[in-house]
Regions:
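Phosphate-binding site recognition
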Residues: 1-182, 186
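A cross-kingdom feature that marks ATP-driven nucleic-acid transaction machinery
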Residues: 151-290
């Protein structure tokens, strides 16, 4: 029944596997043979590969960024009510706190201390634990080389669509309630280039996971309050532990500066000396590499 939430109930929420990146490419090519990588990125951004979302777009010949935004942001759109429909029943009476936490994470407030500060100092450790372990809705992200017990942790929403829903639909509830779809579409469109920069990183990490060539894929950043603030987008350690591929992700390859990445890697090597034994490959991943 198309009036039902797209994910269904509890069992589907946990078990429904998204399509692989190569399958997403095959699907959009079937419906739009001349698709651009921008079309592909938009499809990945808004669906994360979830079959039902892709089906809704493709069945309605919605194959580019602007038409996807217009299809989602309108009267009686399942996408507008989707986050609420699939999660309120899951969370029960505590849904308000869970929604506030997920809303914070979607906007980049992504450490436990910062989330607690944003929510007035309430303790959220138990909520975060359940979001990670029971609901599989968020993931703990640690920088390369950090110990399991370390406190240098960020959280991210695992599902692309829910990340989008909390950042734009939930955050702009008053605009949604007024039905001011024109304004909401403008907010989403104006932010699209910036927002999809992070999603492009996620796309490449997913693609690398699917390649089965690596034993570790992640990123690295300095802890706060250190002299050299720097972040490396992707660090991937080969299956045989002899090669480390290090990438800066930029939508536009012309914005990549090899010297800047090399400086970051030099700093990383002062912290993670074991990497000096490996062959290091530095490079850029951009829209052209999707």
């Amino acid at each position: 029944d198309r009036k039902e939430p797209l994910f269904g109930r509890r069992d589907a929420l946990i078990k429904l596997n998204p399509f692989r990146t190569d399958t997403i490419k095959e699907i959009i090519k079937d419906y739009k043979p001349d698709y651009s990588n921008e079309d592909l990125l938009a499809l990945y951004t808004y669906t994360g590969g979830v079959p039902k979302y892709i089906e809704l777009f493709m069945d309605n010949l919605v194959t580019d960024k602007d038409s996807m935004i217009s299809y989602m942001i309108r009267d009686n759109s399942l996408f507008v009510s989707e986050g609420k429909n699939i999660l309120i029943e899951e969370f029960g009476k505590d849904y308000g706190t869970y929604f506030s936490i997920l809303g914070c994470i979607s906007t980049g407030i992504n450490t436990q201390a910062n989330i607690e500060g944003a929510l007035g100092g309430i303790s959220i450790g138990g909520f975060l634990k359940r979001l990670v372990e029971d609901y599989s809705l968020i993931a703990k992200i640690r920088p390369y080389g950090a110990s399991e017990g370390g406190k240098n942790i960020k959280y991210e929403i695992s599902d692309n669509f829910l990340r989008f829903w909390f950042k734009y639909i939930h955050k702009n509830r008053s605009i949604v309630e007024m039905g001011n779809w024109k304004l909401l579409k403008k907010i989403i469109s104006d932010d699209y280039t910036t927002y999809t920069g992070d999603i492009l990183e996620r796309y490449f990490r997913q693609k690398m996971i699917e390649s089965m060539e690596y034993r570790y894929i992640g990123n690295w950043w300095n802890p706060k309050n250190t002299e050299n603030q720097c972040e490396i987008d992707i660090i991937a350690v080969s299956a045989d532990n002899t090669r480390v591929d290090i990438f800066e992700v930029k939508r536009n390859p012309e914005r990549y500066k090899e010297g800047v990445l090399k400086e970051k890697v030099d700093h990383l090597l002062t912290k993670q000396k074991e990497l000096k034994k490996c062959t290091l490959t530095l490079g850029n991943l951009s829209m052209l590499d999707m």
